[in-house]
Amino acid sequence: MPKSWSRVVISSVAPAIDGGQWPIKRAVGEQVEVTAGVLVDSHDALAVELVVRHASEETEHVTRMPHVENDEYAGAFEVSAPGRYLYRVRAWINRFATWQDQFRRRVEGGEPPSEIESELTAGASLLDEAAEHAPEDDREMLTAHIEAFENGNAEAALGDEIAELARRHAPHHQQTSSATYEVFVDPERARTGAWYEFFPRSVRDDDEHATLDEAAERLPRIQEMGFDIVYLPPIHPIGETNRKGPDDAPEAGPDDPGSPWAIGGFLADGSKGGHKSVHPKLGGIEAFDRFVETAHDLGLEVALDVAFQCSPDHPYVEEHPEWFYHRPDGSLRYAENPPKKYKDVHPINFETEAWPALWAELKSVFEYWIDHGVTTFRVDNPHTKPFAFWQWCLRELREDTPELVVLSEAFTRPKTMYHLAKLGFNNSYTYFTWRNTPDALEAYGEELFHTEAAEYFRPNFWPNTPDILHDELVDGGRPAHKSRFVLAATMSSTYGVYGPPFEHVDTQQRDHKEEYARNEKYEIRTWDWNDPTSLQPFMARVNRLRNENPALQQTRSIRFLDTQHPDLIAYSKAAGDNLIVVVVSLDPHSECEGQLVLPIHDLGLPADEAFSAHDLLHDAHYTWQGTHHYLRLSPDRPAHIFRLEPAGTSEQTHAAYDRLVHA
């Protein structure tokens, strides 16, 4: 026999990941819409509420959950600060609402006055209970209604106001609560960030190793292009032992800089530095601090690469050999992915008997850079490290730094990528690079944005990386670079680009592999930062449109549209009255003509009236009416970004808005 019980049952609370085992994700300013099935035997009325608090606060915030249909109730709350929010559903039998419903039927059924008076007395008794728990103002109103009931005023018993007062203050009869669920709230940049990756050693106009002070001189250009996160590959000393040469050659020449991912090497004074040191040729930690300060002054966040692996020259190798794998002969095992061998790095053994000290030290790597102004990180291959480590590490870090944003670089199996997101990674690389047809992109978009994955997995679309130059970019050249950039920047609300080779349309692959020739991972390159033929103006315009249109700053409203052409993809996004439709050609060689089919009613557009279609990308204005609209895209113009709104509002309103934005 149970010690306590309730007639009320709460089930199917959503959103909840794996029954509430993992938090859902939101960004600051977003809504959490909660639904629950709430049942009671018989015909009693229910009161259902959503109870929410930030984990750092004791105060709970309560909102009603109205009945929707079929015993389902719905409510919502907005998250306004980074960190953890806790929410639960509670419900109880609303005895006054039950009484009021029955009383209304008695009145409408014409029951005799004596019965009505008797029922009013019962209703007054319920209000008495509510008045005992009400503050003074509400108690006075309840007392006035009690007097009206006692005087036989049936009309006073039927109002919504008295029902709400009773619901708010009456004892919660047979109350029960759901389990408590968690929302992790990210800073806004986790939802809207535009990442720009570059190698700081390659910013000079000659082939000499640059400093971070010289790299900082490039930051205004990146800011002018509309990016808000500057991502640097590892900036640490690079090992000399088994250093890789150009294009991953097994041996390096005396002047080859090596791969930044071979972390751990010699500092200017001859000592060894690792994950908490800056390469001496970059200028040391002082230069890094100046770089961060310059970035922050420009409104840019700095993201650092965290790669938990060590070159043979890393101080950990001498100080903690127990943290690494050993061969039978006692030597340290280097990294391998047969048949590939990476002799310039040693993988870390997370299962070492000394794992508590190892884990604490690796967590302190993040803490060191947080102390130097960095709260955004990209983690290299997190899927090759234990899930338990990431769950512990990320949660510990966020106790003191809730604004932390961590991007998972895990090109691996979908379930593994999703699990890393559940563990606490804010963003993740995706398969976007390999989705190159409208059908493939639409199917992938539906999976990411319209399934349960959208509650916790935030995709970050990258058209290229230092490791990946897809054949589509090679074959499609400049048109493909433009179309893939528009797709990345508008289909997802957060995206990134490995900047210099992308904006300069570098299409030279190494040995016909999906990799850049003369890869910057292994050598210093020079770029013409002022090249008038680069994609810089195009990229800047797309980023400006992202910043000006709230619809492009989220993914939940995306809807794929029919174009009646196999090489055209179209989708809409909406936020309030900001309605955007993007159309992109995936044929970089030919002109494509199609018909954009708009679901007028679903998009909130007038069925029988004209509306404005402003192509923001090319500043062209059209007046449309109806559902079908002619499209023609070409290699020179492979994309449209339309803003749709009632005719007569676009040109004047947004000309004024644009003047304000760019003043």
Swiss-Prot record:
A single GO molecular function term of this UniProt record: hydrolase activity, hydrolyzing O-glycosyl compounds
Disulfide pairings: none
EC number: 2.4.99.16
Source species, domain of life: Bacteria
Bilayer-spanning residue ranges: none
Pfam families per the UniProt record, alphabetical: Alpha-amylase, GLGE_C, GlgE_dom_N_S
UniProt KW Repeat keyword: no
Active site: 380, 409
Enzyme class: transferase
Function: Maltosyltransferase that uses maltose 1-phosphate (M1P) as the sugar donor to elongate linear or branched alpha-(1->4)-glucans. Is involved in a branched alpha-glucan biosynthetic pathway from trehalose, together with TreS, Mak and GlgB.
Family recorded in the similarity comment: Belongs to the glycosyl hydrolase 13 family. GlgE subfamily.
Complexes and interactors: Homodimer.
Name of the protein in question: Alpha-1,4-glucan:maltose-1-phosphate maltosyltransferase
Source species taxonomy: Bacteria, Pseudomonadati, Rhodothermota, Rhodothermia, Rhodothermales
